[in-house]
């Protein structure tokens, strides 16, 4: 593995500290996360129900995430990226990507 690469044989990739969002109690924790361009945000379903992580504008979607599943997405450009769980009205979050 070279510098900056994530993962390895038999090892699940992990997001850098501060770029993880937990799904529990039918909410995203934290509801808003701030990161830099090029970073990966990881969502982990720590709930007893399935969820999705779906861009509010429809441009990306995790698909069904059963309990224990996770989803990762890299954000390359600065901006505000709201998302929702399509199964649970009111379950929403935002990724803020700020220039360094």
Which residues make up each language-model segment?
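Extracellular/periplasmic low-complexity linear segments
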Residues: 1-20
């Amino acid at each position: 593995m070279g510098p900056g690469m994530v993962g390895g044989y038999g090892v699940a990739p992990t997001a850098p500290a501060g770029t993880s969002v937990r799904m529990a109690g039918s909410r995203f924790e934290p509801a808003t996360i701030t990161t830099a361009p090029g970073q990966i945000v990881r969502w982990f379903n720590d709930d007893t129900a399935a969820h999705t992580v779906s861009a509010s504008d429809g441009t990306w979607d995790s698909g069904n995430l059963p309990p224990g599943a996770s989803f990762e997405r890299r954000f390359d450009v600065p901006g505000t990226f709201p998302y929702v769980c399509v199964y649970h009205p009111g379950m929403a979050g935002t990724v803020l990507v700020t220039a360094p």
